[in-house]
């Protein structure tokens, strides 16, 4: 009889492979098979801490904390990258190593390295917030959930759909087909403007790397040294902020941002028209009808105020003709009040008349 228990090492190894296979299948289903692995112990510890604390984090602050965690991971990743110095620590090889590290960062910004397409998202964490805010705003104003145009291949779609959009509509739904064609053209224009806007931020990343290279070259030429990873990270942040402040103030950024806003408003207007068409087909009140009703109610309020002012002016004129002030004219008793005073006088007379016989009887 074998002395091995049922839960031997082979069984545990089989269970581990089973769960690893399920985890790998889940990552592939979610598109996370090429996600970057955690290379540093501090980065792994920070990730485990956030996974334990994130379920209890409120929704309104979870996004902010995720950005902070990503900044911390970038800090540890950069510290690990620059801490792995070459074996030959001469000045020439050291400068070559620093130059190669900066060139790799530029390649990551340009997307030339095979990193699953996530290098740009990680390296753009410093400028990801404005783009993320814009995408959230666009998603909230769109009748369709999510950002449907985020991963759309613009050039391929533009080339293939150009012929289809140029074809006229057929049948009794040709007007509706024409509206959908216009909606598609507007969406493609917005996608082109969004890609131009994102490309501008990619150029910011490359210029920041160049500025960081100039800073490191200046440190090497001066004979100084960088004492800690925190100093290196602070200088990197300073380079990014300087480049951002300089480039955002240029007319080029104003034109790019203006084209993006115009394309977004045109797309929003076209979507609103399509929504009104669908609501009208279902015999439901549309947005334009509700807005027309609101305008008419506002006009009615204005007319009532004008009539009230005109009536008050007429009351003043009547009071001036009758020789009374407007206040007394408004508070003057109506003619029906005099009629009500007469019964009171009669009642007093009757009381006096009724009191006289009583007194005569007492004298008798």
From Swiss-Prot:
Write out the annotated subcellular location. Answer: Cytoplasm
Please report the name of this protein according to its UniProt entry: Poly(3-hydroxyalkanoate) polymerase subunit PhaE
Give one Pfam family, short name only: PHA_synth_III_E
The answer to keyword Cytoplasm applying to this record is yes
Q: Where is this region: Disordered?
A: 322-364
Give the protein's function: Polymerizes D(-)-3-hydroxybutyryl-CoA to create polyhydroxybutyrate (PHB) which consists of thousands of hydroxybutyrate molecules linked end to end. This subunit has no catalytic activity but enhances the activity of PhaC, the catalytic subunit.
Q: In which pathway does it act?
A: Biopolymer metabolism; poly-(R)-3-hydroxybutanoate biosynthesis
User: What keywords were assigned to this record?
Assistant: Cytoplasm, PHB biosynthesis
- Organism of provenance: Thiocystis violacea
Which segments cross the bilayer? none
């Amino acid at each position: 009889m074998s002395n091995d228990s049922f839960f031997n090492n082979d069984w545990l190894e089989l269970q581990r492979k089973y769960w690893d296979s399920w985890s790998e299948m889940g990552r592939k289903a979610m598109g996370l098979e090429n996600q970057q692995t955690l290379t540093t112990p501090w980065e792994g510890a920070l990730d485990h801490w956030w996974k334990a604390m994130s379920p209890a984090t409120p929704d309104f602050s979870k996004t902010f904390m995720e950005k902070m965690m990503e900044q911390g991971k970038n800090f540890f990743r950069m510290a690990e990258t620059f801490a792995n110095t070459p074996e030959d620590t001469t000045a020439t090889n050291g400068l070559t190593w620093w130059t190669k590290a900066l060139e790799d960062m530029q390649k990551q910004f340009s997307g030339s390295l095979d990193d699953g397409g996530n290098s740009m998202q990680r390296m753009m964490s410093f400028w990801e917030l404005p783009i993320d805010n814009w995408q959230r705003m666009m998603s909230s104003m769109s009748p369709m959930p999510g950002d449907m145009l985020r991963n759309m291949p613009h050039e391929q779609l533009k080339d293939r759909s150009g012929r289809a959009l140029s074809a006229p509509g057929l049948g009794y739904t040709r007007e509706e087909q024409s509206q959908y064609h216009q909606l598609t053209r507007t969406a493609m224009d917005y996608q082109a403007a969004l890609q131009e806007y994102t490309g501008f931020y990619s150029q910011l990343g490359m210029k920041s790397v160049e500025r960081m290279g100039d800073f490191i070259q200046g440190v090497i030429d001066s004979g100084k040294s960088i004492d800690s990873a925190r100093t290196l990270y602070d200088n990197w942040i300073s380079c990014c902020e300087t480049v951002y402040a300089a480039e955002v103030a240029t007319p080029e950024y104003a034109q790019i941002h203006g084209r993006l806003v115009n394309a977004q408003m045109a797309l929003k207007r076209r979507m609103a028209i399509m929504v009104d068409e669908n609501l009208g087909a279902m015999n439901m009140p549309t947005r334009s009808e509700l807005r027309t009703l609101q305008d008419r109610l506002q006009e009615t309020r204005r007319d009532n105020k004008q009539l009230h002012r005109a009536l008050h002016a007429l009351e003043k004129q009547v009071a001036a003709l009758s020789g009374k002030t407007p206040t007394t004219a408004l508070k003057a008793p109506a003619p029906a009040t005099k009629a009500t005073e007469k019964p009171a006088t009669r009642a007093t007379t009757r009381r006096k008349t009724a009191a006289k016989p009583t007194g005569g009887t007492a004298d008798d």
